[in-house]
Each structure stands twice: as structure tokens, then as C-alpha cells.
Amino acid sequence: MMSSTTIDVPAESSNVAKGKAVLVAAPRPGGWKKGIAIVDFVLRLGAVAAALGAATTMATADQTLPFFTQFFQFEASYDSFTTFQFFVITMALVGCYLVLSLPLSIVSIIRPHALGPKLFLIILDTVFLTLATASAASAAAVVYVAHNGNQDSNWLAICNQFGDFCAQTSGAVVSSLVAVVVFVLLIVMSALALGKH
């Protein structure tokens, strides 16, 4: 007679085949998200260089003509134009944001399926894209008038006299437009990664 506290378990013979468990889990689908996160990080590094390069180039744009009169000295500097001051400040802010967004981009590489960092980055990328586009467009308009003048308003082109100044400001505008294009790519890639979730 068996007591009520014991359980009878039949002994297995060594000849009975045992089922085998899978030790390695199947890879999660969506490994391409890690690739997008790596490209995102590299593009952010490029955008940092473009934005801070644009701000630095514009901030150092200064030229004084070698001739002057008794009362006037002819000088062109970025701080003579409020649009260029706005440009320097906003592109510096954009560059700082991009530097501060690099850790979140690294988190997206480590955890490619995490939604929080991607959503946060896409929202802030859109805000700073707007800021970068506004400053690049306004500076481009002033650079265009500096190169070509405006006959209707009797504004003369100043780039004939201030060639170095115009070259620096034009380079800064081109660099800022590169940053804008990179922002657009970042937003599209983030949207694709979020849309496939």
C-alpha cells in the first residue's frame, strides 16, 4: 500500500529517446532597424559638422576694404546683418542639438526595437529641421541680394567689392543646406523605422 504523500514516477530507461530543446532562439525579425540606426548615427555626425561649420564660417565672415575716407571705413561683417546673426545663433543651436542627440542615436543602435528614443528624435528632428531651414533660407536671400543686388529697390551688389566676405557667407549657406538635407534624410529614415513597427 502506498502512502498518500508519495508519487509514483516511472523510471526512464536510457534507451528511450528524449526530446531536444532549441538552445538558440530564432533571430528577431527587423535586423535592418539596427542598420538604419547605424546610418542615423553617421548622418548625425555629418550634420554636426555641417551645422557647426556653417555657424563658424558665418561668424568669422569679415572683410575691410583697403581704402577709406576721412570719415568712413568700408567694412562688411556678419554682425552688420541681423539675418546673419540669426543664422549664426540658430545653426549653433542646431549643432548643439545634434551633439546632444548622439547618445539617443547610440541607444537606438543598442536597442533597435525601442520606440521611445526614435519617437523623441523624430519630433525634435522636425523642430530643428524647421529652424535650420528658416535660417538657411533667410541667409540665402541676403546672400543672393549681396551677389546680384535688386534693381527695383536700388540695392547694389556688394560682392564686387567684398569678394571674400561673400565667398564665406555663400559657403556657410551651402553648408547649412547640407545640414537641412541630412535632417530630411534622418526624419524619413526614422519614420520608416517607426512605420514598420
UniProtKB/Swiss-Prot annotation:
| InterPro entries linked | CASP/CASPL, CASP_dom, CASPL
- Extract the signal peptide range: none
Q: Name one GO cellular component term.
A: plasma membrane
- Annotated coiled-coil positions are none
All ranges on the Extracellular side of the membrane: 56-85, 140-171
Coarse class of the protein's main subcellular location: membrane
A Pfam family assignment: CASP_dom
Q: Which residues lie on this side of the membrane: Cytoplasmic?
A: 1-34, 107-118, 193-197
Protein's GO biological process = cell wall organization
Q: Which UniProt keywords apply?
A: Cell membrane, Cell wall biogenesis/degradation, Membrane, Transmembrane, Transmembrane helix
What does the record note on quaternary structure?
Homodimer and heterodimers.
Q: What is this protein called?
A: Casparian strip membrane protein 4
Species of provenance: Lotus japonicus (Lotus corniculatus var. japonicus)
